[in-house]
A protein has these predicted regions:
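Noncatalytic alpha-helical scaffold of FAD-dependent oxidoreductases
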Residues: 1-452
Length: 452
């Protein structure tokens, strides 16, 4: 990016910050503050609200520095746009969450993960600097030694909003080679995850990316991928072919780097089947531009609002849309419980180890433990005697029992005491007093559990 272009982008950012501060100042004292956003990847649905701070101008990549392998990015920039800006330079973010419209600010204030997380940790661990508008309306710049920087991940916009980030990048190669390795036994699968993540290789070949797909208790696959300078062929899963189905059919595959990064977006992992677009006839009729996770999410939001599927269903359907981190040595136990009590399939696996040993107080993972993110996104039919939320509570209890953690992007059912035990209530309250003394932003428990 030229010096002139960087100067223009910097000026744009400064003007956007000034305009946002004016918006904040215009909100009556004591009135709650929130964002007005066009997109979301959260699954905590609540009643529509008008107004809010307009952050539409915070969606740009401000600079890409190839010498330092860093990028300056605004908080509402999507990973899709960031990747499009960095790949021409042979670079990418250290962790690129699976869905195109996840924003940098959202991934840092919440949690993100992908197949590079076993070596690069979580997205916020590659952030060097954050510019934040706090709940008090102040704009501050913080780094790794600051309490707000450490406490920002898993705060979900209750301490402030990300305006700008400086993040690390890493080099890429043109192609990614994938090996889909089957396992009939979850314990053996977990053992290999531990081995691969410790050694960075499998059977003598390097492994740069690790994730997995569980189709049943007797059928799970690890996808072990590595960079490649060339490819004998490349597959395309952005049209008629469906990526997750290829896992069972191919032992080796090749993708371009961009298609690898977005391999899960076209079918929202496998959740597009709920909309009928995996049927071959329907698939051919749907324009490719609509085969995207953000399109499906809008359909789900509309359905939640109007309760169409709930009215059509004979049984009460409980949404079970969660990502949980389980210590790898308890993974098989969790999967056995999950198959028995919940019964959703497929299930996604993604190993993660913290990169920064200093840790992140609001999501207190042990830096000495390799965790496996287990993702599952569907609905479960409840028996007449079951209350809505009962299956999610079963999962929450099991995750706590096994020493795991649960992301807060979707429905949560913890009581308040348990919630603050899990998410470091004392530290959160100290941060809240310092950066949102008047309580203009919602409390984390109120936002994530009470949906306020």
């Amino acid at each position: 990016m030229s010096d002139h272009r960087q100067s223009l982008e910097s000026d744009h950012h400064d003007r956007a910050v000034a305009a946002l501060r004016e918006q904040y100042a215009a909100i009556p004292a004591g009135a709650p503050v929130r964002l007005a956003k066009a997109t979301s990847n959260l699954f905590r649905f609540r009643a529509e609200q008008s107004g809010g701070l307009d952050v539409a101008r915070f969606d740009r990549v401000l600079s890409v520095d190839t010498a330092t392998r860093t990028a300056q990015v605004q908080g509402m920039t999507t990973y899709e746009n960031l990747v499009d800006a960095t790949l021409p330079h042979g670079l990418m973010p250290l962790v690129v969450p699976q869905l195109k419209t996840i924003t940098l600010g959202g991934a840092v204030a919440g949690l993100g993960i992908e197949s590079s997380s076993y070596r690069n940790g979580l997205p916020h661990e590659s952030v060097r600097e954050l510019e934040v508008m706090t709940g008090d309306g102040e704009v501050v710049v913080v780094g790794p030694e600051d309490d707000l920087f450490r406490g920002f991940p898993n705060s979900y916009g209750t301490l402030g909003y990300t305006l700008r980030l400086k993040i690390d990048l890493e080099p890429v190669k043109p192609y990614v080679r994938l090996r889909h390795v089957p396992f009939a036994d979850a314990a053996e699968c977990a053992r290999v995850i531990s081995e691969v993540c410790a050694e960075g290789s499998y059977r003598g070949e390097p492994v740069d990316f690790v994730d997995g797909t569980v189709f049943s208790g007797r059928e799970q696959y690890l996808t072990l991928a590595n960079w490649a300078d060339s490819a004998p062929f490349t597959s395309d899963y952005t049209g008629n072919a469906i990526y997750y189905r290829s896992i069972q059919r191919r032992s080796v595959d090749y993708l371009t780097v961009r298609d690898y990064l977005w391999r899960w977006d076209t079918d929202w992992f496998w959740c597009s089947r709920a909309f009928g677009v995996q049927h071959p006839v329907v698939r051919r009729l749907v324009p490719k531009r609509y085969l995207r996770s953000d399109v499906y999410r809008k359909v789900v939001a509309w359905d939640r609002r109007h309760r169409l599927s709930a009215r059509l269903s004979k049984a009460v359907q409980e949404p079970v849309i969660q990502d949980v981190e389980i210590p790898v040595d308890r993974l098989a136990e969790f999967l056995e419980f999950f198959h028995r009590e919940i019964g959703i399939s497929p299930v996604w696996l993604c190993p993660v180890r913290l990169k920064d040993r200093a840790g992140w107080p609001l999501y207190p993972m042990d830096p000495d433990v390799l965790y496996v993110n287990v993702g599952f996104w569907s609905t479960v039919s409840l028996r007449p005697d079951e209350e809505l939320g009962s299956r999610n509570r079963l999962i929450e209890d099991k995750v706590t029992e096994l020493g795991g953690h649960k992301s807060l992007y979707s429905d949560s059912y913890y009581d308040e005491e348990e919630f603050w035990d899990n998410y470091n209530g004392p530290t959160y309250r100290d941060l809240k007093k310092r950066y949102d003394q008047a309580g203009r932003l919602p409390d984390l428990y109120a936002k994530c559990v009470l949906r306020r």
